[in-house]
Design a protein with these regions (language model features):
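Short alpha-helix carrying the canonical HExxH Zn2+-binding catalytic motif
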Residues: 115-126
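N-terminal, motif-rich segments that launch catalysis or mediate targeting to/interaction with membranes
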Residues: 1-109, 117, 135-226
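Catalytic Zn2+-binding segment of zinc metalloproteases
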Residues: 126-138
């Protein structure tokens, strides 16, 4: 599906149907990750950048929420080895690059609000690929059960320092970086997983989401020449 076809499909499918709710993520966990990412940046010495992001946190979170509306959530999957997504939708790495470039364009136009909104949507994908189901291109198989469990326990896995910075100079590469790590944890969070295996996997993957989000935010601000 080319870019024009995908844009048309997003318009037609924006209203969604009940099925899309089964594969959409939980945006409140993303909001938690965004908040922690900003804290990490501040603790890591990027206080000015963290202060700017904090002022726009509500806007970033709205972008995160928008990214799951309708069928857009079906473009949140990416096998890190063959680079394919959940067919026929685009892969998450390409979608992240597209959103990031749009955010940067809006920034250069002077529209900071729209830029941070789109940055939130792009960061959503970096975070989603810390979930093994997204890296394995598996929409079900315990996906929603695991994400609901994380929603109820995310505070237990909060980190506040040591962001992961300078992964790559390509927005898509941030998605692929996380997907490669998450890939190996699928057996621990699939329908055969247990609360014990959930906890083990989440102790690695949720801090990864927070730390790479800090790096991704700083990467954007550096690209914006801040």
């Amino acid at each position: 599906m080319g870019p024009l076809s995908w844009n048309a499909a997003k318009i037609l499918l924006a209203a969604g149907t009940p099925i899309h709710l089964l594969v959409a993520g939980r945006w409140d966990t993303h909001s938690f990750i965004n908040c922690q990412a900003i804290k990490i940046m501040g603790c890591d010495g990027f206080s000015a950048q963290a202060a700017l992001l904090k002022r726009y946190l509500d806007t970033i979170d709205q972008g995160v929420k928008w990214a799951d509306k309708g069928w857009k959530c079906c473009a949140h999957y990416c096998d890190p080895f063959d680079k394919n997504g959940l067919k026929p939708w685009p892969d998450a790495a390409s979608e992240c690059r597209n959103l990031f470039e749009r955010a940067l364009f809006k920034w250069k136009q002077g529209n900071k609000g729209k830029a941070f909104f789109l940055l939130g949507a792009a960061a959503h994908l970096v975070q989603d690929l810390c979930v093994p189901h997204h890296a394995r291109r598996v929409a079900f198989a315990g996906h929603q059960i695991y994400e609901k469990w994380v929603q109820g326990h995310h505070d237990e896995f909060a980190v506040s320092e040591n962001g992961i910075y300078n992964i790559t100079d390509d927005p898509a590469g941030w998605v692929l970086h996380n997907a490669k790590i998450a890939w190996d944890y699928f057996p621990y969070v699939s329908q055969t997983g247990s609360k014990t295996s959930y906890r083990m996997a989440t102790s690695i993957l949720l801090p990864l989401a927070q730390r790479t989000s800090a790096g991704f935010f700083l990467y954007f601000l550096n690209k914006a020449n801040l």
